[in-house]
From Swiss-Prot:
Disulfide bonds: none annotated. This is Arginine--tRNA ligase. The lineage of its organism: Bacteria, Bacillati, Actinomycetota, Actinomycetes, Micrococcales. It holds the Pfam family DALR_1. Monomer. GO terms for molecular function: arginine-tRNA ligase activity; ATP binding. Gene3D superfamilies: Arginyl tRNA synthetase N-terminal domain, HUPs, Isoleucyl-tRNA Synthetase, Domain 1. It is found in: Cytoplasm. Keywords: Aminoacyl-tRNA synthetase, ATP-binding, Cytoplasm, Ligase, Nucleotide-binding, Protein biosynthesis. Belongs to the class-I aminoacyl-tRNA synthetase family.
Length: 562
């Protein structure tokens, strides 16, 4: 029995209970129930049962009933659900459910029949989502903040897709502007053997790219004026840098569907269309020769200039055009991942969304990520050999590899600053979280291989034999996985999946470590193969499948052996 099965059965019972109360004259005509009104949770104390619900306490006031009495009514009916061993009232109105071993164990078959689809759902079935992340201008290698967004963004895309969304991964960039000018001047200075400009970019990569630009130029660079030389380095240098960024991200397992150039907003007329639309909606005014958007009407702390008095578009005009462009492309939900230094942008962007007539935090969601630090020998790593003063994605991957890097960056909430301990991630021990999970998966494959050699197969399945406390706990962890994936999608929190498979790995290791033989998949010595061994193989393989599914959602490999 899956949580969804129990939830559906409980929903039917609660609906019937409410209908009975209506029939006896209770004034609950406006009470419309959905499955979400009938929640199931894992009890913190497993001694209380397999599942718990506070549905009676949630509905008692609306139903005009005493919570414990309503809970008792629901529990009495729920005790008759196929696969439920008991339903008991606890405390002020909780209902605790215990499942029969056969019903709980049936999950192993369900998982193996579903395979890679176990954990997927239809929460966002068909929803068109634009997920914009990384979006670093091509002035240098991807820094640690961008690396975090690469791992988190790609994982979130996978999780949203698992819940049925049609996700477009998008990278927004600009190869003009002041940052690019500084980059071009830095390249030119390196080529000419001059000191790095005071506001320029340093690091070994500048010299590398400058040399490539010079080597690839079909002509005599020295014959050009300094301004023309700088334009050569700007154009060719940014192209080389951007290709390097794409290549590094690809090696990190992150690819984008769309690379959106800021200049196209003006070339396509998107900015002008956005301003015209907002004017038609009555949110534009002119003052001191400038064009303003009245964002204070939508909660912003001040109105925003969108066209300066000299006719030049202000920075926010690009945001207006870009958002409208996404909506015109059909995206119903737009997610933008920004660094902590962009926190002040949230108010104005949400006001912009509302000015267009859309819904903040629905049509546009903004995720803010905190800083990332690398730590080695207990001290922060402050310098990159290649990039100078910034520490990069390459530095992290070179130290610990792609899998450990991705897992380390995705397993913590983006709301918190992250210290990545390189020494820990290099360890082949249970202290290392990615090793812990990957080793659990590899162990499931090793057990399966050894079982085959010992003549244990899945020709029999008797889930009622899965009665050991570690088996009940492991089945509980497996049951939780689809719910965790749905929550991760709904809350845009991929770390929930990582933490879930860490917990599952722990439950599996505990099951494997039982020493009295009561959970063994492979018979000892001359012991004959029994249906208990065969059934445990189902549980072993189901665990491997879920670990594999979870690792795939966070973009980490599931090794067959370690």
């Amino acid at each position: 029995m899956t949580p969804a099965d129990l939830s559906a059965a409980l929903f039917a019972i609660v609906t019937t209970a409410m209908d009975r109360r209506r029939a006896t004259g209770a004034d609950i005509a406006g009470l419309e129930l959905t499955v979400e009104d009938v929640p199931l949770e894992r009890p913190k104390n497993r001694g209380h049962g397999d599942w718990s619900s506070n549905v009676a306490m949630r509905l008692a006031k609306k139903a005009g009933a005493n919570p414990r009495e309503l809970a008792a009514e629901i529990a009495e009916a729920a005790a008759g659900i196929d696969g439920v061993a008991s339903a008991e009232v606890a405390g002020p109105g909780f209902i605790n459910f215990r499942l029969e071993a056969a019903a709980a164990g049936q999950l192993a078959r369900t998982i193996l029949e579903a395979g890679a689809a176990y954990g997927t759902g239809d929460l966002y079935d068909g929803l068109l989502v634009n997920l914009e992340f990384v979006s670093a201008n091509p002035t240098g290698p991807i820094h640690l903040g961008g690396a975090r967004w690469a791992a988190v963004g790609d994982s979130l895309a996978r999780i949203l897709q698992a819940e049925g969304a049609d996700v477009t991964r998008e990278y927004y960039f600009n190869d003009h502007g002041s940052q690019i000018d500084r980059f071009a001047r830095s390249l030119l200075a390196a080529h000419r053997g001059e000191a790095t400009p005071e506001d320029g970019y340093g690091g070994g990569y500048i010299g590398e790219i400058a040399a490539k630009v010079a080597a690839g130029y079909d002509g005599d660079l020295a014959a050009l004026s300094r301004d023309d030389q700088q334009e050569v380095f700007r154009s060719a240098g940014t192209a080389l840098m951007f290709q390097e960024i794409k290549d590094r991200l690809h090696s990190f397992g992150v690819d984008f569907d769309v690379y959106f150039h800021e200049d196209s907003l003006h070339a396509s007329g998107a900015v002008e269309r956005a301003i015209r639309r907002l004017d038609e909606l009555g949110h534009i005014f002119e003052e001191d020769g400038a064009v303003w958007l009245r964002t204070t009407a939508f909660g912003d702390d001040r109105d925003r200039v969108i066209v300066r008095s000299n006719g030049e578009p202000a920075y926010i005009s690009g945001d207006l055009g870009y958002y409208l462009d996404k909506r015109e492309r059909g995206f119903e939900q737009n997610i933008i991942m920004l660094g902590a230094d962009h926190h002040g942008y949230i108010g104005r962007l949400m006001a912009m969304v509302e000015a267009f007539g859309d819904i903040p935090n629905v049509n546009l969601q903004i995720l803010i990520g905190q800083m990332v630090n690398l730590v080695r020998d207990g001290e922060p790593v402050k310098m990159s050999k290649r990039a100078g003063t910034i520490v990069t994605l390459d530095d992290l991957v070179d130290a610990v590899g792609v899998d450990a890097a991705r897992y380390a960056l995705v397993r913590s909430s983006t709301d918190s600053q992250l210290d990545v301990d390189l020494d820990l991630l290099a360890k082949r021990s249970n202290e290392n979280p990615v090793y812990y999970v990957q080793y659990a998966h590899a162990r499931t494959r090793s057990v399966a291989a050894n079982a085959e050699r010992a003549g244990v197969d899945r020709s029999a399945f008797k889930p009622e034999l899965l009665t050991h406390e570690t088996e009940s706990a492991l089945l509980g962890g497996l049951q939780e996985f689809p719910r965790v994936v749905a929550q991760a999608a709904e809350l845009s929190e991929p770390h929930r999946v990582a933490r879930s498979i860490e917990e599952l790995a722990g439950l599996y290791h505990a099951w494997y470590a039982v020493r009295d033989g009561s959970t063994r998949v492979i018979p000892l010595g001359e012991e004959p193969v029994t249906d208990a061994h065969r059934t445990r193989l189902w549980l072993n393989d189901a665990t491997g499948q879920v670990l594999r599914n979870g690792l795939r959602l966070v973009g980490v490999s599931a090794p067959e052996r370690m």
